[in-house]
């Protein structure tokens, strides 16, 4: 015998059979973690454990790839040799280990299945820490006794969901005991996996090559110093700064140090200087799993080594809900890492695989647990290590996840992902069994509140991805030969862009929600599928629809190729979108929508197609060009570039030292040298602006913090930029990733990032995986203890920032890959704003070029006000915001000073350049007049006059106003101020009102209209699209003008702000008429959309399309006629449009059904027509069990509002519950179903559409 010692607690069971552990093991869900400490190890030779090796074939049985047979359960067996191990002093035979694992897998096949079927939805509250200490750490060990395994399937899912107090919910929660973890490990090493055939990798590679265009990893700017090596001289730096040279001869200075990392990746070989200033001394941010004993040889079980690498340093695990103190990057060099129980990713952790050669995480056939990688640990049915909606800051990227060898019946998933904002999965291949009946899944996600996934490829499996989260974004997902590519079982909103589904059974499965004892019935809120292709797949998309919980589903730029059924609804045999060899969709969707009349269901329809500007599309194309995307640069092959570690050149990142100058020096030099700036983890204090020049490429580590603090960021009235990206007018390259921009308060004046640069090539100026956080973290001085949520008074030191990010005019920023902007939800105190410009070089270059420099400076000055003030340029009655917060921001002293200064300076410095066409201060004058009128306050109580006036009693004419309101300070003063300003809205209409106030209120003063200031340089008011300007005369109304000129009275009113009352139009107004219709119709007081459409022989919905102000249920037709008049267009404005035929090769483009039929038919035999249902019906539906109104509408192709109209026994709120089984409901009324038919002896008047107005008097 020989003794072996593994310093990190990692034992190789090829050589070790007897282990006496003298340290305490912590059982957690899915893996056994052994804290590193001393141990005694005793070993014997290989022959004992490897004797009678025929058991190998059973352990590594290969499933029938692509075959039709059910997967064979894994048989774990060993030979007759009764080798034994010592486990915690208890002898355990290898045969016993096989038996333990076999029983456990049988139990897991049941309990994991129940976990999938009993979804745990989000919790939105934090637990009381005092109540969970000691309980949260440990779940009960998996009970894998044979009696339990056999009895559990007899408990139905329904019983488990209803049993809130019993033990059934606890049966879904388990931990892997030390005994079971050890047994799984012994078997994994005693019979190592056979080498991969490479089939899955080939499939993944071939499909990606088939559909994706190649792209460069990075854009390399040219070096400013052009020498043979680019580094032969000192770089130009700021005065008094340390010169940066290529110091390759100095030891331990940040150069590339070749270590035994088995990786060529520069980060793995760089001296690791990353440190958390708030963690204990010696805490490691970067940890290479091989430094902790992992082998990566595909033979040694690396589970314990990996988990030790993750947990090292007393990190935020079982007894910690969250932490910003202990970040970690866990690096995996190339290799194959065999694991037999789950790898637990701690809070604030990155798993980073070698980007040049992705490592493989290989799950053993003896794997026990649910997820090979898991982001949260269940310790109760609703209790986990971390609150799932608060599970921030984690990523996994650059891996191959191989679970093909795991038990096909145990519902194992490669990644169990329960996460929130600031999280990502990137560059991962998932390999699963392709045998029929297997239960393996790539990703299992049941809850969370946000995140991002990109560049993922799924091969095989029961589900490629099983998804549920609040709001999520994915890009470049590929599914190959999965039974179901992905299922989305709940969300609030999900955007899937760039999806490829090839040779699967079903493409996408959308469900209305799963059960569970704590379920809220949450279903899929909405899903948008953009730039996708589904090919060689029998069923493209399957969805279940529920009247109370209907999926809202939109497709844009999607192609179905060789798909039998493109989209089908559950329980219906006919697809709602037929398949074919080639079905191309520009824009299509269905779902619930709401308006003032209620909530309605819109069945499948073509939708207006968004025109994609060239700047937004890339080279990839499935149907039409896809939206442009760019993956984050990996810098895995630097070529001639140099990595500059900022800590090697003076930056401290210690959360105390001012690093502004050191960082600016490095950034300036690196940009000159075209080098990569590496910012190891740390908290880098900046007390002035950090300047990122054009040509910068910056990479952080575990979200290195750039923390603004100090006097320059404290003044709320003088915002100061913390990080400035380029200068105004710059064009070129900037690449930034893995930074966290933050503050240490008080920083009321901080603008965290100002982005000025514009891309030189598509996507060359970008920001990836970088976050903005103000408050709520160690060192911010803005935590709960500093800024209590319900403080009685405002603490000005708790105003965290002026702005998180400002993208200046003329800049372009490619912000992608999970950038998170986190700030307090409450806006308190005064604020400064991004503002806007009234004139700029890009828009007004010709005008500005003829002005003096002083005048140009004055005219291009920023208006530092909220966007609401921009509306003042429209000149109108003062806006009532009915919101004190908005009003106080608009009427702040800072906004007033900004507008007043602009107006006065332009008036002073630019008057000499005024011409008949161009009055330089025109726009500023309008703004200034608008501000003064809007921000006028009542002397009684200080309420804004616009709000006071908004509360006056409604009247039709000013003469009907109460004297107390007409003669009030606010009303009379607003009119007087308007009369005094040549820039205001004051005209003949308001002159009449001012005269009225003087007559009734005993006031005196001028009422004449001042000569208006004109500016025709850029004023659209003199533009008339129809080229028809009409001058009103006495007696005109909207209806009379509309009938005379064959236009819509509503279009006239909406497009003519001069018209205040459609029934009382002041004469002498010059009005630009809208485009005319060929035919108009004046409708009477009893008309409905249906009666009008019937009279003209129109399909249902045509009147609403021609007059889009009418709502979906036509309920506002009569109500809004008071304002809009009574004249409708019954033909298109500006002529009739003829639709183009579909492009060649397109089959079954979806259309929209009007819901009407051509002729009446009798109700089905032996059925009773529902009470009140119309008999003018050509299509019927007999209600049956499990029907919903939404499903009936989809099947019948009828809009929900029309369905309710023809079946009045049903209501919008309770439609489904009011359905009577066996009753017949009309789902296809005939045209004119609502009309009272005349006697047969009286011929019905024919309606003839002419080129004149029609008044049929229905």
UniProtKB/Swiss-Prot annotation:
PROSITE patterns (UniProt xref): LYSM
Annotated keywords: Chitin-binding, Lyase, Repeat, Virulence
UniProt note: phenotype after gene disruption: Leads to enhanced fungal virulence, with faster decaying on infected fruits.
Key word Nucleotidyltransferase present: no
Coiled coil feature spans: none
Positions of region (Disordered): 148-168
Domain spans labelled LysM: 1028-1073, 1179-1227
Record bears the keyword Lyase: yes
Entry GO MF terms: chitin binding; lyase activity
This protein's domain notes: The LysM (lysin motif) domains are small globular domains involved in binding chitin in eukaryotes. LysM1 contains one LysM domain.
The protein's name: Non-secreted LysM effector LysM19
UniProt lineage: Eukaryota, Fungi, Dikarya, Ascomycota, Pezizomycotina
Name of the encoding gene: LysM19
